[in-house]
């Protein structure tokens, strides 16, 4: 069980701080049911409520600094399997995002990055599906790593590149 003040990942939205754990005083809500009150750190003023008894697959622990460093160093070894069928590719992207798994998210980032380079060589742009999932995956992964490693978001990509090259 999470407690007030914990930071978690709300899949697929954002890093959130648990502001409260308890029953909600809102109309249409079971007043005997406990909820986590989450405050997304990048969406000031927003609130997300998740039933305490229904968190599986919806929130997860944020990774530790040590795990973040180990993850970054393992990024070159993450396999990015290409999927030729456009519909199946979007389904795989969606599954990776909804899993909340940094490894799966990094794999689709690598895949889309490679597709972007290949399409650029052909004088083409990325598909809107690839572009949309690339931005979402990049936001999810880089936001968590930036937060955990205390590196400004605008510098995290270079930080990762420098770490991989070291």
Where are these regions (language model features)?
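Conserved nucleotide-binding/hydrolysis micro-motifs of P-loop NTPases
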Residues: 23-25, 43-45, 55-56
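Absolute protein N-terminus
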Residues: 1-2
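A short macromolecule-binding patch
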Residues: 37-52
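Short, solvent-exposed secondary-structure boundary/capping segments
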Residues: 24-35
């Amino acid at each position: 069980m999470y407690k007030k003040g914990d930071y978690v990942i709300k899949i697929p939205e954002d890093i959130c701080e648990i502001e409260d754990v308890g029953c909600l005083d809102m109309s249409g809500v079971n007043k005997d049911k406990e909820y986590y009150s989450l405050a997304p750190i990048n969406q000031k003023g927003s609130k997300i409520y998740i039933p305490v008894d229904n968190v599986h697959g919806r929130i997860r622990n944020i990774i530790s600094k040590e795990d973040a460093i180990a993850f970054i160093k393992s990024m070159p070894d993450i396999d990015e399997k290409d999927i030729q069928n456009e519909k199946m590719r979007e389904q795989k992207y969606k599954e990776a995002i909804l899993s909340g798994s940094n490894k799966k998210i990094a794999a689709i980032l690598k895949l889309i990055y490679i597709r972007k380079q290949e399409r650029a060589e052909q004088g083409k742009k990325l598909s809107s599906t690839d572009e949309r999932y690339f931005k979402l995956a990049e936001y999810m992964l880089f936001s968590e790593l930036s937060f955990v490693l205390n590196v400004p978001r605008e510098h995290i990509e270079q930080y990762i590149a420098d770490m991989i090259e070291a």
